[in-house]
Swiss-Prot record:
Family: Belongs to the thiamine-phosphate synthase family.
Protein name per Swiss-Prot or TrEMBL: Thiamine-phosphate synthase
Annotated source species: Lacticaseibacillus paracasei (strain ATCC 334 / BCRC 17002 / CCUG 31169 / CIP 107868 / KCTC 3260 / NRRL B-441)
Catalytic class of the enzyme: transferase
Cited function: Condenses 4-methyl-5-(beta-hydroxyethyl)thiazole monophosphate (THZ-P) and 2-methyl-4-amino-5-hydroxymethyl pyrimidine pyrophosphate (HMP-PP) to form thiamine monophosphate (TMP).
Amino acid sequence: MNATDLKLYLVTHRYDDNEATFLAKIAAACENSVTMVQLREKMLSTRAYFELAQRVKLITDRYQIPLIIDDRVDICLAVDAAGVHIGDDELPVAMTRQLIGPDKVLGVSTKTVETAVAAVAAGADYLGVGAIFPTQTKANAAVTPIATLKAITAQVAVPVVAIGGVKEANLATFKDTGIAGVAIVSEIMQAPDIAHKVQALRTKLKAVLPNDR
């Protein structure tokens, strides 16, 4: 896997923002040191997704932050993103690895130790585990217990990122879980002051992540 910092992983969501506002939010988050950005767009046409990904990559490249594309291997390759993140409904992990090659980052969503171990064996570079807390972004997502998160981090040799309802107020929950970082959606994308929120999250994470001192 490419040298990748997963500490504060922004996963985008458009909500009701127009494109200019959406891009400005991503830029503010990057300027204030999120460490990775995942572009997640479920409703756009392929052409629209490609064009948006190009614009987002201009921002992430400016700040030298890796861009990960959610689900779409074709979009990842078309814009030369750093990698792709897949879930249960996408291509199998091994097939995705074959398509993107050995050098791009492959993230995989998982909820159990068994699927986590299988994903790593098939070529995953990092795992996204959750939803740890209830989340409006994926309202029907089953909650993954902290005990399961700890069991996964203990069983796999790749970095694990906690996702789902993660907020500044609950970051302390992740102390001593073995995670490499947290993936955050609404806490950043809907923050009234994104710069302040990202800085506050980075400060709180220093007390939570053993590699963030």
